[in-house]
């Protein structure tokens, strides 16, 4: 005769039975409010069931509280942004902040937020950096500036620069002028920068005139039939012609200084070529 297997109640069975017991008692207590048997029914509930019920209630209350806080914060952001959309306010969470897959990838923005009417175009200065009154002649939106035309239009400024240089030189030579050392040094620096600017403009004008004259000669010879097609200078040929023209336009002292600089440069180049590394023996 086979014996029957004894089935022991597991921990989960006890937990389910205690939960059923707790729910049964609570439902019964709701239906029989004010009866004398409430205390007896509550005394039969185990402490484990009461503890589990308390933790469930705490979790439910905490979840409800966080949902209310998120709703309030999203409602405040909605009214602060001033959007006229009729939709519900968005819930702000950490999921909205998306990280880039690559640092060179373009930045992503939400399509639910309204785009500002004034946008910053890359390559152009922003609206915040610009002043109220701007000069459209130097605006980058109108293309690259023509330096030759600008130089021709503002050539009259050279007279003012020359007059300013003469005033500075006379002020430095005047022994009666009550200038301290700092003021003299500042005037000397301004005078030097102004002279270097004038030299740069003069050299640029010389280069433009030489190249324009050469181009005119080529076009005239082409029209007369002396050449089959006009010859445009290479960079090396252009540099040689400009150096020769600059050397011819220099004064004797300036030529000596230029020759001395060129000689030192050539010597330094030769010394660098003669240098050698000692071999390890």
From Swiss-Prot:
Coiled coil: 48-78, 161-205
Primary subcellular site in the record, as a coarse category: nucleus
Pfam family, one: RRP36
GO biological process: maturation of SSU-rRNA from tricistronic rRNA transcript (SSU-rRNA, 5.8S rRNA, LSU-rRNA)
Keywords, comma-separated and alphabetical: Coiled coil, Nucleus, Ribonucleoprotein, Ribosome biogenesis, rRNA processing
Ranges annotated as biased composition (Basic and acidic residues): 65-75, 245-259
InterPro entries from the UniProt entry: RRP36 (IPR009292)
Chain segments carrying region Disordered: 1-135, 243-281
Subcellular compartments: Nucleus, Nucleolus
Polar residues biased stretches: 24-36
Gene Ontology cellular-component terms listed: 90S preribosome; nucleolus
Record text on subunit structure and interactions: Associates with 90S and pre-40S pre-ribosomal particles.
Family to which the UniProt record says this protein belongs: Belongs to the RRP36 family.
Role summary: Component of the 90S pre-ribosome involved in the maturation of rRNAs. Required for early cleavages of the pre-RNAs in the 40S ribosomal subunit maturation pathway.
Name of protein: rRNA biogenesis protein RRP36
Gene from which this protein is expressed: RRP36
């Amino acid at each position: 005769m086979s014996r029957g297997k004894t089935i022991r109640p597991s921990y989960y069975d006890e937990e389910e039975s205690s939960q059923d017991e707790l729910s049964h008692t609570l439902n019964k207590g709701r239906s029989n409010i004010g009866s004398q048997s409430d205390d007896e029914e509550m005394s039969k509930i185990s402490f484990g069931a009461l503890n589990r019920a308390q933790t469930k209630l705490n979790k439910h209350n905490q979840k409800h509280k966080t949902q209310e806080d998120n709703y309030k914060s999203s409602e405040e952001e909605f009214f602060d942004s001033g959007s006229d959309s009729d939709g519900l306010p968005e819930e702000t969470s950490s999921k909205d902040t998306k990280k880039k897959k690559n640092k060179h990838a373009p930045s992503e923005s939400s399509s639910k937020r309204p785009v500002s009417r004034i946008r910053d175009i890359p390559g152009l200065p922003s609206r915040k950096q610009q002043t109220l009154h701007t000069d459209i002649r130097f605006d980058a939106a109108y293309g690259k500036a023509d330096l030759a035309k600008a130089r021709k239009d503002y050539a009259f400024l050279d007279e003012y620069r020359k007059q300013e240089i003469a005033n500075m030189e006379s002020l430095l030579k005047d022994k009666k002028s009550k200038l301290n050392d700092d003021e003299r040094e500042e005037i000397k620096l301004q005078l030097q920068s102004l002279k270097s600017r004038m030299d740069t403009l003069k050299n640029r004008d010389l280069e433009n005139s030489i190249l324009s004259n050469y181009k005119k000669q080529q076009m005239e010879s082409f029209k007369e039939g002396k050449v089959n097609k006009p010859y445009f200078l290479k960079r090396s040929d252009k540099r040689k012609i400009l150096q020769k023209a600059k050397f011819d336009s220099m004064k004797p002292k300036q030529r000596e200084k230029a020759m001395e600089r060129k000689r030192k440069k050539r010597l330094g180049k030769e010394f660098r070529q003669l240098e050698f590394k000692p071999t390890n023996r």
